[in-house]
């Protein structure tokens, strides 16, 4: 056990040559405020005057005080005492006043004479038969107010220095507090509590007990009743200023201290646990037991540090040989290792991979599957294309002719415009992968490569040029992929929604919209009927008044209903199409409600209606079915099917058949004698192009009626059908200005109004665009990552080593490339010195065989 403290002293000497304590050696740290008597306690422990004295801050650097006990000579002769400084290893100071002067000189050398402080410690060894084996660290006293040229933050500097020592878990804290101050205001105890809140490694020292006011004592503090500490409190008596002036020796003051505690009426009960001698023995035991408990961990730490430093030294390598052969072999070895690490980083085979984030090839996979794929999926197939753009493209594609079908060239133009949008994110994906490969190169930091600054810079330059060279064909391939998709629009692709599928989809969609609208009209009518019935009941009109005023109410109701139907027909394109279809084709015009018809007659059969009229198309059919209703329904269904296909295929503009093949019915809806309204035509059928299949007489009547209506419409300006809307738009231009034509505008845009046919065609193009663009997106998402991997990533992996050898393996470059940096040479020397120190420390620790005794 007696050898433990000298062992720690040797370890401190060994590590102090490095200027640091990497092992956190066990030590005792003395902390106290300025003028707390801290230095006097240390002098009492040593038994000699050797510390600087004066006003203000005196201790301005940490003092590591190593006390070594010398045995007394057998003949009883006096044994010499001396001190040694680590910065003067060959000088022995027998005069302790010279030790004081050397402390002042070395402090001024480091901090100057302006009362500044420094964290660089002073190591002092004192050999004496009057001391116990002990190691203490005396820190500067905590001050509040700067003195002289001290910086304004002197208090914070001292606190940081103190905390750096006492926060170590192997440090025993000696908190010095004068007895004539309030213990609650003790700076030493406050700092100790911050790092040792439970007080397990803090021992309190109460100084200046003899200077307390008469009638007061520190018994409560010394017994631990005020602030409990595991190691307790010890009281000591310091020399007074009068004793110092009288040159009273420390040994005499120690004797006076013993007598003080024995004769004091209160402290005599704890005299055997008070005084400087008891403090020295207590600290000696605490330090020895503390060293004993921490010694096994110290051995493990020393062994681990030795292994780590040896591994670090191996990365710096040995000094280079002068021969060209050895330099060339070393260069090839470094290139091979770097190339292998580059490939392994991409393939995920690198051993020292990070566990906290994605690295290397995993980041490239993230770019493909998360960033690029997500971006392509979010591209809207119809973004940047409005309905007007689609209609304008279709009209431009037909030229001066009216096409029978939707021009396919318009679909191809719109598809190509959208496919080109995939080129930018694909090219950006190439840049992302290129940057990621550069990131891998910069992060590799091969240990063998870090020795040579010039070689490292040239390797990175060559690899970046290689990546840049392979990036060019990669981007070219991406451009070709987009051009391939735009070169041929494969409408025969199995995944393309074309042909009957798209027609059926749009037809069902159109039917659903029309049914929903008719259902809304029916609901509105029923709601109106209920409101009228409730209003009649609330008015309490008698039967006579009902008889007199009934017809007027019914007429008013019928007029309101007709207005509502006309408004719905004018605002709803589907209802217009239905009404126009019934007027175009045989089967009779839409039925109109008679002025004197009662509301309850709407639900009865056709016997209550005139012979050539049917029920209004906008009024719900709630009555039982009859032949007329069936005929009307069949005609309506036939017309719906015909209008669907006629919206896709263009018929010839025969004047007798309207604008696109349907019979022109202007001014015939109210003509009961018109051939279109005759019941004999209710059974006629129509082909899919909107043409009429009927007898010759009916065809002639229809043609004559249509021609007369076509001529009359010029003067009457009455166009109930949407097929004549284009004629109305330019009527004034041709007939209102004589024989002069308007000037042709420099820019002609498609009209804003869309006919039902144009709506159908644009909707068809939109559906086809979405279907085909999704096919292209799927192809591009698959082809772009494959192209990048082949042309950029894999090509770089295969050619990196050959490229480095071809560019760098030249004898005239060996000296330049293999020149070591000064930092590497300095680190190699530091590692060798650390290895030597750790080996000595390991030998010192191994000197203690049985440290448990």
Curated annotation (Swiss-Prot):
It comes from Dictyostelium discoideum. Residues 762-853 form the GED domain. It is found in: Cytoplasm. This is Dynamin-A. GTP binds at residues 32-40, 207-213, 238-241. Residues 32-39 are annotated as: G1 motif. GO terms for biological process: actin filament organization; endosome organization; establishment or maintenance of cell polarity; intracellular distribution of mitochondria; midbody abscission; mitochondrial fission; mitochondrion organization; nucleus organization. Residues 207-210 are annotated as: G4 motif. Residues 610-624 have a biased composition (Polar residues). The keyword Protease does not apply. The gene is dymA. Residues 237-240 are annotated as: G5 motif.
